Every structure is written in C-alpha cells, then in structure tokens.
C-alpha cells in the first residue's frame, strides 16, 4: 500500500472484480490501469481490495477502512449481488455473518421481499458516496444487478460466461468494464 503514483485507483467488489476465471492482467482493474497509463502517460496504481463472495457491506467497510491510508483519486466499485446481506445468524448470536436472502427465509415482517436488500444497498451507496466526497475521491460504480442501474453511473453491461470456470465473465466483459470506468475517469484527468 506504499505505492503512490500520479493517479491512484482503489477498486473493490466481488469475484467479478477479483477476476475469477481470467488471468490477472485480463481482470478489469488491471485493464483499467493500462488504459489510464496509455491515455495519460502518467504512473498509475491500482489497489484491488475485492474478494470473492463479497457483500455490499464488505465493499463499503473495506473502502471505509482504507480510504485514509490509500488516498485514492478514484474509487471504482463493481457492486456484488445485493442478496449477499450481512446479518446476525440468529437473535441470540452477536456474530454477524453473510447470508443470502431467499424467498423462503426472508423475514416475515417485510411485505415486499426485496425491501430489505434494496434498503441495505441504498444505505451503503449513500455512505460510500459521502465517504468518497469527504476524502476528495471520485466515486464510480456499476453492478451485476440490472435493476440497480438507475442508482449508479452509467449503463448495465451483462456478464458473459466465457471465463475458464464457465461461471464468471470472460476477458471481453472485463475489457468492457475497464472501458466503462475509464470513460468516467477520463472526464476528471
């Protein structure tokens, strides 16, 4: 984390940002780094703090813990699926664990089964926008969930499944993702 460049970029998300199924240099954060270097002729650092299986809470908590240390010019997030919710595993247990909310285990006191996950996503989105503004970082995000695109910058781009594992996006999708983030970064450099 000591690396400082002319342009410092923090990236975070889930396996889509880690680059599961593609070579590291093909993952969108590292394609983005090369695009920024090529078009600016400046030094660029990428701090990819993504982890496979991450929740929206993980993303915001990770940025919160590191933004003062890394001092990024840009925070680029590819939001994980919003069904990954961190919550107590039961009422008597103080440990918070990540759970996947499904129709059959959704809390009965919520009439609309999507209300809680949408609320938690928006709460985290607002917090991350405030964090990046307070730290003078430009915040850019996108998501695997098409319905959430109205709340973030840019257009939804569907994931192809051409990665080695057959489940995650392949190199072409990562290139498209890097170009999305570069388009927004390029407006500010």
List each model region and its residues.
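Alpha-helical cap/lid subdomain in secreted, periplasmic
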Residues: 60-189
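Serine-esterase "nucleophile elbow" of acetyl-processing enzymes
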Residues: 1-52, 57
């Amino acid at each position: 984390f000591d690396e400082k460049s002319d342009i410092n970029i923090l990236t975070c998300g889930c396996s889509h940002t880690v680059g599961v199924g593609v070579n590291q240099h093909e993952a969108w954060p590292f394609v983005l780094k090369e695009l920024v270097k090529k078009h600016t002729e400046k030094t660029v650092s990428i701090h990819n703090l993504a982890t496979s299986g991450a929740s929206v809470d993980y993303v915001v908590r990770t940025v919160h813990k590191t933004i003062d240390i890394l001092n990024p010019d840009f925070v680029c997030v590819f939001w994980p699926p919003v069904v990954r919710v961190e919550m107590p595993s039961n009422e008597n247990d103080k440990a918070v664990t990540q759970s996947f909310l499904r129709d059959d285990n959704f809390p009965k006191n919520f009439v609309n089964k999507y209300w809680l996950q949408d609320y938690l996503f928006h709460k985290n989105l607002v917090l991350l926008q405030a964090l990046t503004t307070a730290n003078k970082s430009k915040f850019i995000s996108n998501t695997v969930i098409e319905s959430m695109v109205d709340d973030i910058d840019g257009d939804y781009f569907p994931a192809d499944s051409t990665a080695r594992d057959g489940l995650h996006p392949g190199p072409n999708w990562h290139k498209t993702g890097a170009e999305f983030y570069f388009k927004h970064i390029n407006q500010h450099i």
